[in-house]
Amino acid sequence: MAMGSGGGAGSEQEDTVLFRRGTGQSDDSDIWDDTALIKAYDKAVASFKHALKNGDMCETSDKPKGTARRKPAKKNKNQKKNATAPLKQWKAGDKCSAVWSEDGCVYPATITSVDLKRETCVVVYTGYGNKEEQNLSDLLSPTCEVANNTEQNTQENESQVSTDDSEHSSRSLRSKAHSKSKAAPWTSFLPPPPPVPGAGLGPGKPGLRFSGPPPPPPPPPPFLPCWMPPFPSGPPIIPPPPPISPDCLDDTDALGSMLISWYMSGYHTGYYMGFRQNKKEGKKCSHTN
């Protein structure tokens, strides 16, 4: 195929023929021969490399570099042969690892019989005695069972650690709540009551006249309008002690209740005397002015 240039230039440029049909080729020739396509591709690649080497992308070279001719890819059969790895030649008595069909886990086993025609075998699981028919292609090496057990143990240990951490945190929260519930009710600004004296004191001994449980502490005195304190607020009133169970009324409990009642009585008395003293000082200041 030829094309003439216009304008009477007389120059002709012959294009490269990529494919021509029915030009004397025999019927037995390979109709899928892509030699011309390979040559055209090699020519384009060579011209592109030459343009990159010269630093000019627009200039193309007519002389292609000598490049190796690519051969058609006809390695399908070889690739299939290489992809199919040969099976291991298992025989009776070999140690292996097999997947138990009931749970899908890998267990160590021993081959008892092999059927080469069916490519199957019968295995006995070590330590269990169960027999099962397995395909020879499904058998694993004994090291696979060890790796599987190691992974399972790691997962179990991680779950156990997370469970222990949650139990430890819940126990710490319960212990904190229990310690708070056992804390003494003396949370006001006043100090706690004095400690109980030694075992030398008790009902029926010198210095004590009470033989039974003391009466409940008196309520705090009501504040009259004329006794309102001049300062913004006074000390908070301590709560009464918890009631004593009748089953726990012994000498020590009775003595402790008596001392608590004395302490609260002195507290309310001092509180009242402070109001009186403050009132007297206020009257003196008013007379002086």
Swiss-Prot record:
There is a cross-link at K49, K205 (Glycyl lysine isopeptide (Lys-Gly) (interchain with G-Cter in SUMO2)). The SMN complex catalyzes the assembly of small nuclear ribonucleoproteins (snRNPs), the building blocks of the spliceosome, and thereby plays an important role in the splicing of cellular pre-mRNAs. Most spliceosomal snRNPs contain a common set of Sm proteins SNRPB, SNRPD1, SNRPD2, SNRPD3, SNRPE, SNRPF and SNRPG that assemble in a heptameric protein ring on the Sm site of the small nuclear RNA to form the core snRNP (Sm core). This is Survival motor neuron protein. Residues 212-226 have a biased composition (Pro residues). The Tudor domain mediates association with dimethylarginines, which are common in snRNP proteins. Residues 95-205 are annotated as: Required for interaction with RPP20/POP7. Homooligomer; may form higher order homooligomers in the dimer to octamer range. Part of the core SMN complex that contains SMN1, GEMIN2/SIP1, DDX20/GEMIN3, GEMIN4, GEMIN5, GEMIN6, GEMIN7, GEMIN8 and STRAP/UNRIP. Part of the SMN-Sm complex that contains SMN1, GEMIN2/SIP1, DDX20/GEMIN3, GEMIN4, GEMIN5, GEMIN6, GEMIN7, GEMIN8, STRAP/UNRIP and the Sm proteins SNRPB, SNRPD1, SNRPD2, SNRPD3, SNRPE, SNRPF and SNRPG. Component of an import snRNP complex composed of KPNB1, RNUT1, SMN1 and ZNF259. It is found in: Nucleus, Gem; Nucleus, Cajal body; Cytoplasm; Cytoplasmic granule. Belongs to the SMN family. Residues 1-10 have a biased composition (Gly residues). CDD domains: SMN_C, SMN_N, Tudor_SMN. The modification Phosphothreonine is found at T23, T67. The modification Phosphoserine is found at S26, S29. Pfam families: SMN_G2-BD, SMN_Tudor, SMN_YG-box. InterPro entries: Smn1, SMN_C, SMN_G2-BD, SMN_Tudor, Tudor, Tudor_SMN_eumet. It comes from Rattus norvegicus. Residues 274-289 are annotated as: Required for interaction with SYNCRIP. Residues 89-149 form the Tudor domain. Keywords: Cell projection, Cytoplasm, Isopeptide bond, mRNA processing, mRNA splicing, Neurogenesis, Nucleus, Phosphoprotein, RNA-binding, Ubl conjugation. GO terms for molecular function: fibroblast growth factor binding; identical protein binding; RNA binding. Residues 1-27, 55-88, 150-226 are annotated as: Disordered. Residues 66-80, 171-181 have a biased composition (Basic residues). GO terms for biological process: axonogenesis; chemical synaptic transmission; DNA-templated transcription termination; microtubule depolymerization; positive regulation of RNA splicing; regulation of neuron projection development; spliceosomal complex assembly; spliceosomal snRNP assembly. The gene is Smn1. One of its GO terms (cellular component) is SMN-Sm protein complex. Its main location: nucleus. Residues 11-42 are annotated as: P1 (binding site for GEMIN2). Residues 235-262 are annotated as: P2 (binding site for SM B).
